Amino acid sequence: MSSLPRGFEPQTPEDLGQRSLAELREMLKRQERLLRNVKFICKLPDKGKKISDAVTKLKAAIAEREEVRGRSELFYPVSLDCKERQKAIAVVDGDRDKAQNSDQILDTSSPVPGCSSVANITSSQTTSRQQGLAHPTRGGDAEAAEAEHTVSEHPTSSSGAPAPSSSQASEGLPQHCALGQVEDHPGSSDNLFIDRLQRITIADPTEHHSEGNRNPENLAGLWSGPQKKPHYMEVLEMRAKNPMPPPHKFKTNVLPSQPRDSSSACQRRGSPISSEERRRRDRKHLDDITAARLLPLHHLPTQLLSIEESLALQRQQKQSYEEIQAKLAAQKLAERLNIKMQSYNPEGESSRKYREVRDEDDDQSSEDEF
C-alpha cells in the first residue's frame, strides 16, 4: 500500500476554510499533479478517489472565494461611502452633545426671577463660543446677538462702572428666563434642542454682517449630501470612457505611427505634390529607414517600341544567344577531347635566336643613293 507524499494529503473541509486563496490554488495544483501520475494512481487502493474528491472540493472552495472577492470589490465603494457617512454622523452627534451641554449651562437659572446675574450669562456665552469654534454649524444669530447686546449695555465692574443689581439683570432678561422655563417640558425638548443647535454660530467681531435664517433641511444635508468619489474610481471611469490603444508590436525598419500619421495629415491638408517631389520624399524616407541608397540606373526606363523594332531586338538577342551557346559547346567539346588550343610555331624557338647581318658597305651605298 503506497502512501501520499508529504504535502499532498487531501485536506479536510475545516482546513480549507482557514486557507488563503493562494494556498488553495497551490494545493489544487499538487492534487492535479498527482492525478496526472497514472502509475501512482493505479497503486492506490481506492484508485485516486480521495484525490479526485479533494480536487472537487478545492475547486468549489476556490470558486466561492473568487465570488466573495468579486462581490467585495463591487461593494467596496459603497462601504467607503457608508464609512464616511458614519463619520459625519458621529461628528454631528458630538456637536449635539456639546450643544446640549452648553444649552443646559445657558438655561440654568434660579426659581426666583431675581437671582440671575450677568456673570452667568457671560460665562455661558463664552462656553457656547468655544464650542462653536471647535464645531461650527449653520443657523441664525438671533439669540446670541441679544445676549451680546445685553452684556454690552451692562458692563462689569472691572471696566470702571458700577455693576447693576440682580433685579435690573433679571428685568433685562425676561425673554431668556421664559425660554428656560419652556425648555423644562419634556415633550418639546427635542424640538428646542434642534432649534438651539441651528442657532449656534460664530460671528466675526470686525465684520458685522447678518445672515438669513437657514432651513432645518440644511442640518440633515451635513451627512446626507453627495459624497466625493475616491480618486481610483474616477481614474477607472475615465479609463473606461477613453481606453488606451493596444501597444503595437515592435518591427524592425518601421518608424512609429505618430510621425507617419502627422506627415500624412500634413500632406492631406497641404496642396497636392508633384511626382518628382513624392519620389524624392520616398527616396529620403528609404534612406532614413535602411541607411541604403538605390544603385544608379544603367539602362533607360521602359519605352513603348514598335513591332519592327521589337522584332529586330529579338533577332539580335537570339543571335547573341546562339553565339554564346556555340562557344560554350566548343569549349565543352575541347575539354572532352583534351585538345589544348595553343599558338603554332613550326620553326621553334631557335629561329628567333639568329639575327640578320648586313654589311656596312651596303648601308653606305644606300645612303649615297638618297
From Swiss-Prot:
Residues 29-68, 300-315 are annotated as: Important for transcription repressor activity. GO terms for cellular component: I band; neuronal cell body; nuclear envelope; RNA polymerase II, core complex; transcription preinitiation complex. Disulfide bonds: none annotated. The keyword Phosphoprotein applies. Residues 155-170 have a biased composition (Low complexity). Residues 15-69, 303-328 form a coiled coil. Dephosphorylated at Ser-271 by the PNUTS-PP1 complex, promoting RNA polymerase II transcription pause-release. One of its GO terms (biological process) is transcription elongation by RNA polymerase II. It comes from the Eukaryota. Residues 359-370 have a biased composition (Acidic residues). Residues 228-299, 316-341 are annotated as: Interaction with Pol II. Residues 1-20, 93-172, 204-226, 241-283, 340-370 are annotated as: Disordered. Residues 101-131, 254-266 have a biased composition (Polar residues). Residues 138-152, 205-214, 349-358 have a biased composition (Basic and acidic residues). One of its GO terms (molecular function) is transcription elongation factor activity. Keywords: Coiled coil, DNA-directed RNA polymerase, Nucleus, Phosphoprotein, Transcription. It is found in: Nucleus. The modification Phosphoserine is found at residue 271. It holds the Pfam family GCOM2. Belongs to the GRINL1 family. Component of the Pol II(G) complex, which contains the RNA polymerase II (Pol II) core complex subunits and POLR2M and appears to be an abundant form of Pol II. Appears to be a stable component of the Pol II(G) complex form of RNA polymerase II (Pol II). Pol II synthesizes mRNA precursors and many functional non-coding RNAs and is the central component of the basal RNA polymerase II transcription machinery. May play a role in Mediator complex-dependent regulation of transcription activation. Acts in vitro as a negative regulator of transcriptional activation; this repression is relieved by the Mediator complex, which restores Pol II(G) activator-dependent transcription to a level equivalent to that of Pol II. This is DNA-directed RNA polymerase II subunit GRINL1A. It comes from Bos taurus (Bovine).
